[in-house]
């Protein structure tokens, strides 16, 4: 008899009361571990082991956004999940990040996280400390968009760093079973054909 067990989509471990120096040692220990995301803020470390499904959504989001930037003739730099840090205060690895337009700084204009575990919105404080203007969470098949105002993130319906982007089209395409059809549909939608 074969028994199939549902595997968790992502695995998450959070540990409090960790110093920055301890975090850097943990970070060093995971330096050659693919599929691991590390976060640090307020003496708390989060270690996230991402699933194949997580990576599929992450890559599809990036791929479709790159298609959008190219179609709309928008300069961009895809930063992927590079480690964003500020002093000894905060470290984050978004699933995808982008510098948009002529931006040349180290702080992305947009960071995106795929969330299969809890804690999406609570992660905003990390990005606020980093000064990231806009953060998107892909959770339960929909995007939650947040734009940084003077002292906090505000939930928004439409991206302010990419106001012409149809978020509903992007979401719909991400949920399509065929990746090829999803890309074709998205390209048709953004080109107006």
Where does each model-flagged region fall?
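Gly/Pro/Ser/Thr-rich low-complexity, intrinsically disordered segments predominantly at protein N-termini
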Residues: 1-130, 137-193
